[in-house]
């Protein structure tokens, strides 16, 4: 059936008796392509019928469909004429794995982070009414994303729509998971709703019966509706959404296309906000994904037959090094606790949970809360470690500054996926952490160049930190580069790893491997280039920088992050203040968002790979 889907709204030509065949074709298509390219699989397998129903009811690109997070938008892309783009899904210059407005008019709003869809949708509703247009606006948010504080803020603001008689449709896609299993009060509440189907049946039966009473049926129904709060309390404790002023419908079967089409068509006719609670199965149609949806949330290329990832390295990842070190230290120190924001597996803390369930805390998709939660524990003598992707810690900036740094609490931030992350693109690149953390007083920022240094930095911080500390490390394998030259850590001190003559490269963290490649290339050409590992970004080693300024006329600073406010800018300003007469050049990322692609491809594009660094120095020497 998929051969008939080539443009937006083509699905409307499919007959209802063929919906199941189309759903099966879509799942086969997803499995065939994502197994080859990698990507977000389980969530997309689970949302096939729901997305079909939305496309049967909505008119694209006129109507506006917003996906929270956006990783579950693959089916939407298939149904809007982009199925050929799956050959290069998440590849360099290929189709994005997230909604992207410049990719299609059918992508109403870009996304990549969680809990933002309701705010964006409410803004669109407001614009619709000011502009006097009549498009339908729908937000799709998962039960995991609904645990984020921003979603509650939007729901609170959204309550005014009922008084203003304005329509907004929210689809609560309830698959009982975000990336890992959901936690917290909202998850428990939705579980109650799922299991109290008698309320939906009761409400419908009573209203229909009352309407049949001659003369007074409508009046009694009105009375019933006015007193519905007390009736609902008997069957669904709290009725959270209705209490917020938002009509609630559900739960309904998210794999029943005709039922969802009927529900959506009815919802479009309302002049008020409505939440349609849809229950789906993450990973549906592929047994390995159904059995282990967390593994198949985001997965590298894998064997369709076995479900196993095709390329596995025997070397430990930075994530594993961090996690293993944390576990070893926690065995010796009962004050060490670990915190994650709904990503125990991605951050490696799942293993910590197995060892210390009473000292492990998954707070849900709630980075702001996680930061201040850690501050509270640190204020009472505990040693909290918040392992979080660099891009997601941005969401807790004010809490770091106000709740942690002002009190100088020794909270440790394990910044996973720092630097370029690759295929997830603009919304996930961890390239802003140096500027936004380095401006905060009391904050220490560290960047290891290999696995041993990462482990030692964590141990040193756990036992000696006097205030907040961030340790930033990249996705992928832990490097073993220069591990044999490891020197004991001293606070705020860097390390010279190779002396040179013509120039020196100060290379931050994970970009050090590229600087090392450049040094080797230039050595073959007769140049002697020094290599320095700064270790500490804030405070950086001023004594070492002064020594380098007295030795070299050319200092190059390389980092896998934005140049504006980066390490290079800080060092350059310091050298300028101390009347350095030589030249300083900074390599990094200009004022831009970086698209998706492999890390090696992106480094080449940004000219921070080994060859490009060598070429920059080579040209510099000729000037």
Report each predicted region and the residues it spans:
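N-terminal amphipathic, basic-rich helices that act as targeting or association modules
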Residues: 1-78, 240-242, 246-257, 277-280
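Long, well-ordered, tryptophan-enriched scaffold segments
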Residues: 13, 175-322
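Structural signature of the thiamine diphosphate
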Residues: 220-288, 410-415, 434-484, 610-623
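Glycine-/acidic-rich phosphate or pyrophosphate-binding loops and their flanking alpha/beta elements
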Residues: 262-265, 297-298, 307, 317-332, ...
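Peripheral docking tails and interdomain loops at the edges
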Residues: 301-305, 309-314, 422-424, 444, ...
């Amino acid at each position: 059936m998929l051969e008939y889907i080539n443009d937006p709204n083509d699905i409307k030509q499919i007959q209802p008796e063929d919906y199941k065949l189309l759903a099966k074709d879509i799942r086969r298509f997803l499995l065939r392509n994502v197994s080859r390219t990698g990507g977000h699989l389980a969530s997309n397998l689970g949302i096939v019928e729901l997305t079909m129903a939305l496309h049967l009811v909505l008119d694209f690109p006129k109507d506006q469909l917003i996906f929270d997070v956006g990783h579950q938008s693959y089916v939407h892309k298939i149904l809007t004429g982009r199925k050929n783009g799956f050959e290069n899904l998440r590849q360099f210059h290929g189709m994005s794995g997230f909604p992207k407005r410049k990719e299609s008019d059918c992508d109403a709003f870009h996304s990549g982070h969680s809990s933002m869809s309701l705010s964006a949708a409410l803004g669109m509703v407001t614009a619709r009414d000011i502009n006097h247009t009549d498009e339908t606006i729908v937000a799709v948010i998962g039960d995991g994303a609904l645990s984020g504080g921003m979603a509650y803020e939007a729901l609170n603001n959204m309550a005014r729509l009922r008084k203003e008689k304005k329509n907004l449709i929210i689809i609560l896609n309830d698959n009982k998971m975000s990336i890992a299993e959901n936690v917290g009060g909202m998850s428990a509440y939705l579980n109650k709703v799922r299991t109290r189907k008698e309320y939906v049946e009761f409400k419908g039966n009573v209203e229909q019966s009352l309407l049949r009473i001659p003369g007074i049926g409508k009046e009694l129904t009105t009375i019933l509706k006015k007193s519905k709060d007390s009736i609902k309390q008997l069957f669904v404790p709290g009725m959270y959404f209705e209490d917020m002023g938002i009509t609630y419908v559900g739960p309904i079967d998210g794999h029943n296309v005709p039922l969802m089409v009927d529900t959506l068509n009815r919802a479009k006719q309302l002049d008020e906000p409505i939440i349609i609670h849809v229950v789906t199965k993450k990973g549906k149609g592929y047994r390995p994904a159904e059995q282990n949806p967390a593994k198949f949330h985001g997965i590298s290329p894998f064997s369709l037959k076995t479900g196993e990832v095709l390329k596995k390295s025997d070397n430990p990842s930075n994530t594993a090094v961090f996690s293993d070190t944390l576990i070893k230290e926690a065995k010796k120190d009962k004050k060490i606790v670990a915190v994650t924001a709904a990503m125990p597996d991605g951050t490696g803390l799942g293993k910590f949970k197995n060892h210390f369930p009473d000292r492990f805390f998954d707070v849900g998709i709630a980075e702001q809360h996680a930061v201040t939660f850690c501050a509270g524990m640190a204020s009472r003598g505990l040693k909290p470690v918040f392992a979080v992707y660099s891009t997601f810690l941005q969401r807790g900036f004010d809490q770091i500054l106000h709740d942690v740094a002002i009190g100088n609490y020794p909270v440790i931030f394990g910044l996973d996926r720092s630097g370029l992350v690759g295929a997830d693109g603009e919304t996930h690149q961890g390239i802003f952490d140096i500027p936004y953390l380095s401006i905060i007083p009391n904050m220490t920022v560290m960047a290891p160049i290999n696995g041993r240094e990462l482990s030692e930095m964590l141990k040193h911080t756990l036992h000696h930190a006097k205030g907040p500390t961030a340790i930033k490390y990249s996705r992928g394998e832990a490097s073993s580069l220069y591990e044999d030259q490891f020197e004991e850590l001293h606070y705020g001190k860097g390390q010279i790893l190779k002396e040179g003559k013509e120039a020196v490269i100060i290379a931050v963290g994970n970009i050090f491997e590229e600087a090392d490649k450049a040094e080797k290339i230039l050595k073959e050409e007769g140049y002697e280039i020094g290599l320095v590992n700064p270790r500490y970004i804030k405070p950086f080693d001023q004594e070492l920088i002064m020594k380098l300024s007295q030795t070299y006329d050319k200092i190059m600073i390389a980092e896998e992050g934005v140049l504006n406010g980066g390490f290079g800018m800080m060092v350059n300003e310091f050298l300028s203040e101390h009347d350095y007469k030589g030249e300083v050049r900074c390599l990094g990322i200009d004022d831009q968002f970086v698209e998706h692609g492999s890390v090696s491809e992106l480094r080449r594009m940004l000219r921070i790979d080994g060859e490009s660094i060598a070429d920059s120095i080579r040209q510099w020497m000729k000037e």
